[in-house]
Amino acid sequence: MGKENYCFLSNHFSSYEMIYSESKDCVEIINPFSNDNIIVDYIPEDEFTPYICQFSFQHRHYENEEDVVEYISEIINQNIYAIEFFKDGKNRFGGDITTHELSELSYEFLEQRSGYYGSTKLKDVVDSFKVRGWNPCNDFDATFVYDDNGDITIVKTNYK
């Protein structure tokens, strides 16, 4: 295993500093804006999805270099962000959210997207969430606030 397994990243992201770690056998694409770097691992023993891409709270498994490049490009171009949900400060689950979805963000949207809209509601399993992007100017933390009618609104905190 070695650095040669990550050459394809240099071809696409040469304007970013990349650090290869022999001890961890991974490449880290350095984020010039924050500490949320992109880490790519290659695990050849996994014949189906040998690449793991990590950004912020999230990770994804990929089977080929092209999909890895596409995912990283989406992050760097700020088309997708990492979103993580919490309950009492503990991670519950997460995923990605697009720029368009962020522009129309509502509790109802998050509930539908998460799948917690049946007998178990999103509000029953989480109480806050965080959004992180390549450029932290769009990062924020948020909580759910309930009004007297039972309606839920999102209140952003730690907005950059």
Where are the language model's segments positioned?
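Generic recognition of long tandem-repeat/solenoid scaffolds
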Residues: 25-32, 50-53, 93-95
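Histidine (H) residue identity feature
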Residues: 12, 59-61, 100
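Surface-exposed polar/charged interaction patches
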Residues: 12-19, 75-78, 116, 128, ...
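Hydrophobic beta-strand residues in large extracellular and virion-surface proteins
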Residues: 9, 27-29, 38-40, 50, ...
